Amino acid sequence: MVRPYPLIYFLFLPLGACFPLLDRREPTDAMGGLGAGERWADLAMGPRPHSVWGSSRWLRASQPQALLVIARGLQTSGREHAGCRFRFGRQDEGSEATGFLPAAGEKTSGPLGNLAEELNGYSRKKGGFSFRFGRR
């Protein structure tokens, strides 16, 4: 007597139904030019979403300045009242506008460098980290 095993039928499903399709586009050359199979019309459509098995391209932040705005918003939202306040190291106590302007002998960095300094509390001007816990 043969008993039907419905679980076995799942093993016979095509792999395309179980896993997402592979990224079958041809790779570009080392200098970032067009691949042999890509057309200008395909490039005009913009980047395509990649599957899990596709190429491992990291998504880049489209507007790094937005990260700075988010960091400022997090500082002023409700974390000040929690007893732990992080002070932006490049910012003087009395002036709000001088936080992103470099001083005379200071190196200038991009917005991501400023964000790293603000989130980590690192200050090149003062030569180290500065954290404040509690109230002023």
From Swiss-Prot:
Biological process terms in GO annotation: grooming behavior; locomotory behavior; neuropeptide signaling pathway; positive regulation of blood pressure; regulation of feeding behavior
Positions carrying Phenylalanine amide: 133
Tissue-specific expression: Expressed widely in the brain with highest expression levels in the cerebellum, medulla, pituitary, retina, vestibular nucleus, and white matter. Also expressed in the bladder, colon, coronary artery, parathyroid gland, prostate, testis, and thyroid.
Keyword field contains Secreted: yes
N-terminal signal peptide: 1-18
Propeptide: 19-90
Tagged with keyword Cell membrane: no
Subcellular localization(s) per the UniProt record: Secreted
GO cellular component annotations of the record: extracellular region
A GO term, aspect molecular function: orexigenic neuropeptide QRFP receptor binding
Subunit structure, interactors included: Ligand for the G-protein coupled receptor QRFPR/GPR103.
Family: Belongs to the RFamide neuropeptide family.
Name recorded for this polypeptide: Orexigenic neuropeptide QRFP
Species: Homo sapiens
